[in-house]
């Protein structure tokens, strides 16, 4: 069953899987104020919906997302202060969206069927997992326009090694799916007619795990990455103890010892 939300379409193709599909092909699925607002609203709602175990971000058309809408940015220059108040609002909103994806207790998968540039590439780098078509391409081309991709850089440098990130940022060149997988920007790529099924299969596999364990694990993953080695082990040791005291962990261990499938809480 589909729920039309203008430029964002949501459906539940498998149990526990919420798919959010950007459908503003005229703008190249740009991360406009409206698109980001709808994504933020949908992800916030999914975060507290127990029926949602995992989220897929996908798109219609040959462009996953072209980044911010440059026509809107140009028009904003006609406003007060050469558009500075609008620019601040736009990038604050984008930062909020990216942080929401990271802080969402549900894993978020990017399904990239085409081109992802600038903030669109940033969104790919921000997602927990990313799967692309073999024809997909990625770039942070702002430098070609005299506008360095500084905010996409935040996500990019957390997804790939510095030298690879700097090469993308300084040249603005496209990389293909083979290179994107090689540097760690995406997990894997498939032929376009296989992409949806492969992504859904992975999403379903994760959706069948303990929601509690997945949520705790995702939070711990990003939290410990900011710590030094000793702090990280101290923090994750406490998380392991807390996790062991949860009912799902008790059930999972018991099921393993009894050689049966665990019955986790829904």
Enumerate the predicted regions with their spans.
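Conserved CoA-thioester-binding segment of acyl-CoA-metabolizing enzymes
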Residues: 1-60, 99
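Crotonase-fold acyl-CoA enzyme core
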Residues: 99-212, 246, 251-254, 260
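C-terminal alpha-helix plus adjacent terminal tail
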Residues: 1-15, 172-178, 197, 201-266
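Glycine- (often His-adjacent) and acidic-residue-rich active-site loop
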Residues: 44, 59-100, 228
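Hydrophobic alpha-helical membrane-association signature
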Residues: 35-39, 90-93, 195, 236
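Hydrophobic alpha-helical segments typical of transmembrane helices
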Residues: 86, 93, 97, 152-155, ...
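Terminal peptide-recognition signature
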Residues: 20, 24, 39, 57, ...
């Amino acid at each position: 069953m589909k729920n039309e939300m203008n430029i964002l379409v949501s459906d539940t193709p498998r149990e526990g899987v919420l798919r959010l599909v950007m459908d503003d092909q005229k703008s190249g699925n740009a991360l406009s104020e409206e698109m980001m607002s709808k994504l933020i609203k949908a992800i916030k709602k999914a975060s507290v919906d127990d029926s949602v175990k995992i989220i897929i971000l996908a798109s219609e058309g040959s462009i996953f997302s072209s980044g911010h809408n440059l026509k809107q940015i140009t028009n904003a220059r006609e406003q007060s202060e050469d558009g500075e108040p609008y620019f601040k609002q736009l990038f604050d909103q984008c930062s909020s969206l990216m942080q929401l994806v990271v802080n969402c207790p549900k894993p978020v998968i990017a399904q990239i069927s085409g081109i992802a540039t600038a903030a669109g590439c940033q969104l790919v780098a921000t997602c927990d997992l990313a799967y692309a078509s073999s024809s997909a391409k990625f770039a942070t081309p702002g430098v070609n326009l005299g506008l360095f991709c500084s905010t996409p850089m935040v996500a990019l440098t957390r997804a790939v090694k510095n030298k690879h990130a700097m090469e993308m940022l300084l040249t603005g060149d496209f990389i293909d799916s083979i290179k994107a997988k090689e540097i760690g920007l995406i997990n894997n790529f498939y032929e376009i007619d296989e992409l949806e099924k492969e992504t859904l299969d992975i999403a379903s596999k994760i959706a069948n795990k303990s929601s509690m364990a997945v949520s705790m694990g995702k939070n711990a993953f990003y939290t410990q990455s900011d710590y030094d080695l000793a702090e990280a082990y101290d923090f994750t040791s406490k998380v392991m103890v807390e996790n062991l005291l949860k009912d799902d962990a008790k059930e999972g261990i018991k099921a393993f010892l009894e050689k049966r499938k665990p019955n986790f809480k829904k």
